Amino acid sequence: GNKARDYVDRYFSMNFTDKHLSMNNFKIDDESITMGDKRCKVYSLVDVDCINVPSLVRPFTSIEVNNVSMPVDMVSLLDSIPSAEVVVYNQMLFIPNQKKELSLLEKKKNRHASMPNPSNQIAVEDIKNVQDVIARENKQLVYTHFNLIVGVPIDTDIQRCTNHLENLFSKLGIHISKQSYNQLELFVNSFPGNCYSTNPEYDRFLTLSDAAACLMYKERIQHSEETPLKIYYTDRQGVPVAIDISGKAVSYTHLT
């Protein structure tokens, strides 16, 4: 109860660090939300009117560390947004009735096939590929919505954050939406437990569950394992982390 209330209050004020927090009036325009000494902007990851995402996605990408290629989470770039005081990455998945969605997908394919031109033929092929994957591998269709809330000091140019995100996501083949003019609606719909308020026609897009999982944030801080037999490796930042190689690092009593 109290923890949930505190979390919602902190989300409302975009303040997850200070011990004491205060609420401020909101000033909202098409580009951002101003609250006290902070300005926030909500970035919708996908524009449903013009979906610019790669046809194939992986759960990770690679970076170079000391001339060595290392895998990182696909959206690990969220850790490096310039001037950002707070970053919230909302990941929403809605599981619809599968038979109904497959029926709608078949109707959509037939509609595209009835108008033979290059763009419609590409759409038909894409739908066929999805249907083949679902039939062969028993995959699940989901509706998803991803958005970023970036908070910066009020005297900071938030366009720097926008340029940074557009540049980094473009390297992954994703062009974030430029039509996020409904800032207040996106902010309110992103509240914990309020995701069902997102507009089904405008804010959600249909994809396979595997592809949606690839866009979820999977990074976490690596901690040393509890074991008396410590073998130290370093993480990507060069911080030593103790790794147990016995496979029994549950409690000390399990080790002999």
Where are these predicted regions, by residue range?
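Core alpha/beta catalytic barrel or barrel-like domain that forms the active/cofactor pocket
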Residues: Q179-L186, V239-G247
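Extended, folded cores of ATP/NTP-driven motor/assembly subunits in large transport
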Residues: G1-Y217
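Conserved small/polar residues in nucleotide/adenosyl-binding loops
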Residues: T253-T256
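N-terminal pre-Walker A segment at the start of P-loop NTPase domains
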Residues: I221-I243
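Generic "edge-of-domain/loop-turn" microfeature
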Residues: D155, K248-V250
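Short glycine/proline-enriched loop/turn "hinge" motifs that connect secondary-structure elements
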Residues: R136-L141, Y233-D235, I245-K248
